[in-house]
Structure formats: structure tokens, C-alpha cells
From Swiss-Prot:
Organism: Debaryomyces hansenii (strain ATCC 36239 / CBS 767 / BCRC 21394 / JCM 1990 / NBRC 0083 / IGC 2968)
Claim: Metal-binding is one of the keywords in the record: no
Name of the molecule in the record: Cytochrome c oxidase assembly protein COX16, mitochondrial
Gene Ontology CC, one term: mitochondrial inner membrane
Function: Required for the assembly of the mitochondrial respiratory chain complex IV (CIV), also known as cytochrome c oxidase. May participate in merging the COX1 and COX2 assembly lines.
Segments crossing the lipid bilayer: 34-53
Pfam families in UniProt: COX16
Family that this chain belongs to: Belongs to the COX16 family.
Keyword annotations: Membrane, Mitochondrion, Mitochondrion inner membrane, Transit peptide, Transmembrane, Transmembrane helix
GO BP annotations, alphabetical order: mitochondrial cytochrome c oxidase assembly
Principal location class: mitochondrion
Position of the signal peptide: none
This protein's record includes keyword Mitochondrion: yes
């Protein structure tokens, strides 16, 4: 059996009749303009993919909006009212479990005054 390739053999009259049909005109147009064969299907697949994936992107942005929504005025006021004062030292000792010990030390040292010690004459900085 002889293999002639993918192009079917047509006689002269058959080819002219085929060229007048819609399929023949389309095939002739494809040979002249490669965009219809490569570019158009590519663009259509991109657009179809975008439309198909639109549901997933909508879900993504809804999750984003939930996470970063703006706080209403009433919620903001309730957050401010429930706020406790922040003290770095007390929070540090509280987290270490040493807050009770620290409060005892502070209460025992309340009568302590910080006094600057005078330097020797030779230790004084000279400008």
C-alpha cells in the first residue's frame, strides 16, 4: 500500500471544486495566514482558561477580603476599651513567671536613691 502523506490526492477539477467550498477557502486562508492556525487557538485557550479559572480567583480574593477587612467604628471602640496598659518590664517578668519575685524586690528597694559618685580629678574628661 502506497502512503501519500496527509495530503489527499485530487484531480484538477476536484481541486477547483474543493477550493470553492468553505473548507477549501479556509484551508487556503490557513496556508497564507499562520495566525489563524497558531495564534487564534492560543489566544482562545488563554481567554477560555481565564474564564474557567475566574471562580477560583474569586474565592482567593474573598478570603483576602475576609482577612484584611476594615474594622468598623463600634469594633474599634470595643477593642480600645478592652485594652490593658502595656509595661515592658512587667510583661517580661510575667512571661518568665517571675512577676511576683520582681514586685517583692521593687517594694523592698523603694527607699533607695540613685546618687552620682564624684570622679577623681585625673578621670575627668578634658575637652
Amino acid at each position: 500500500m502506497v502512503h501519500l502523506g496527509s495530503k489527499p490526492f485530487r484531480g484538477k477539477r476536484e481541486q477547483e471544486a474543493y477550493d470553492r467550498t468553505y473548507a477549501g477557502r479556509y484551508q487556503k486562508l490557513l496556508r497564507k495566514n499562520h495566525f489563524l492556525y497558531f495564534g487564534l487557538p492560543f489566544i482562545l485557550s488563554i481567554v477560555a482558561g481565564s474564564l474557567y479559572l475566574q471562580k477560583f480567583t474569586a474565592v482567593k480574593w474573598e478570603k483576602y477580603d475576609e482577612r484584611y477587612r476594615q474594622v468598623g467604628e463600634e469594633e474599634m471602640l470595643s477593642m480600645i476599651e478592652n485594652k490593658r496598659p502595656v509595661d515592658k518590664k512587667n510583661d517580661y517578668y510575667r512571661l518568665q513567671g517571675l512577676l511576683h519575685d520582681h514586685e517583692n524586690e521593687v517594694s523592698s528597694n523603694e527607699d533607695y536613691e540613685i546618687v552620682r559618685v564624684k570622679r577623681k580629678k585625673e578621670d575627668e574628661p578634658v575637652w
